[in-house]
């Protein structure tokens, strides 16, 4: 959530920066609610001051032996008016809060301005896509060859956009996740966490999925109890570890990593990536989250992105890094890098990781703070998150990039210890 004081004092600048994201702030509504809030707040404060003064008068009149019944009646009336004013102020503030929760983060000045993914800027590439001397297969054909990747049975169980993995491919999927966790904990300094897969609405509001993107979530309604939501990413549970906390400066940076399933309705993805594992309702992801000193968050973004890149480098998978433009960034991000891995069957790079600095946007929603030793006061932290990596899409890339002419798959060198020494699948 943006700082409401910043929006009030720099409204036109904020409107302009949001417009680069394709977001049109309802200025008339904001100014109307602000005017109402100020008027009611002023009236309520004046009424409170008058009531306090009248209350003092009652004591003085009583000591003089005067009839205080009229004064008591007036104070009671003022009390009723004051309660009504507070209720009105609360209602206006609730509308303002709802409006503020609908506004995306401001793009950092270094973010390229653009409308959509066509305006993203390539930053660098690593590796060279392999040249095949045989007709390549996609991951679906490779996986179904021995029944180790079974979309038909998955559809029987759960419908479209699910996968059933068996045998060596299931093991390879597990090996990838274990390798990613070991790399991030052993070399990159992250603390592994096991988090709930079900969270309540405040956690999703804290990281920005609610209230705006509820249709993208799977919701479990419970009669008489708070609803549950299946996590769309471990970013939600990991980042909310610090919700409502005031951290000591010595605790920063916090670096968490978790391997979880992720659940998404893919409400806006009708007709896209209907074949295979690229876009699923349920998929595994290794997620990295950092909680940092605000002065160090952009440096932390570069490190976070490098951590995700290291996974692809160790797997020897060609990839590129994109700086997302203003119109393609996620709701909570102020700056984002996407990693795209080479997918031979599609002859193009596909997203496999998104690494974002959210600044104080999520922290303000969560009230996650640290005590700044220079001021001695609690201040908002900065939060970052990134995929390190999406396990299913990494599996797709491994299957396709390591395929051989006979349809078998070479196991990447770095995964062999996790595969019991198996060198070839199929």
Curated annotation (Swiss-Prot):
Domain text: Consists of two distinct domains, a catalytic core and a N-terminal extension that is involved in tRNA binding.
GO molecular function: ATP binding; serine-tRNA ligase activity
Top-level EC class as recorded in UniProt: ligase
Gene that encodes the chain: serS
Similarity comment: family membership: Belongs to the class-II aminoacyl-tRNA synthetase family. Type-1 seryl-tRNA synthetase subfamily.
Keywords on record: Aminoacyl-tRNA synthetase, ATP-binding, Cytoplasm, Ligase, Nucleotide-binding, Protein biosynthesis
Subunit-structure text: Homodimer. The tRNA molecule binds across the dimer.
Record-linked NCBIfam families: serS
Transmembrane residue ranges: none
Protein name (Swiss-Prot/TrEMBL): Serine--tRNA ligase
GO cellular component annotations of the record: cytoplasm
Listed GO biological process terms: selenocysteine biosynthetic process; seryl-tRNA aminoacylation
UniProt subcellular location: Cytoplasm
Pathway(s) per entry: Aminoacyl-tRNA biosynthesis; selenocysteinyl-tRNA(Sec) biosynthesis; L-seryl-tRNA(Sec) from L-serine and tRNA(Sec): step 1/1
UniProt cross-references to Pfam families, sorted A to Z: Seryl_tRNA_N, tRNA-synt_2b
Protein residues bound to ATP: 264-266, 351-354
Originating organism: Azotobacter vinelandii (strain DJ / ATCC BAA-1303)
Reactions listed under catalytic activity: tRNA(Ser) + L-serine + ATP = L-seryl-tRNA(Ser) + AMP + diphosphate + H(+); tRNA(Sec) + L-serine + ATP = L-seryl-tRNA(Sec) + AMP + diphosphate + H(+)
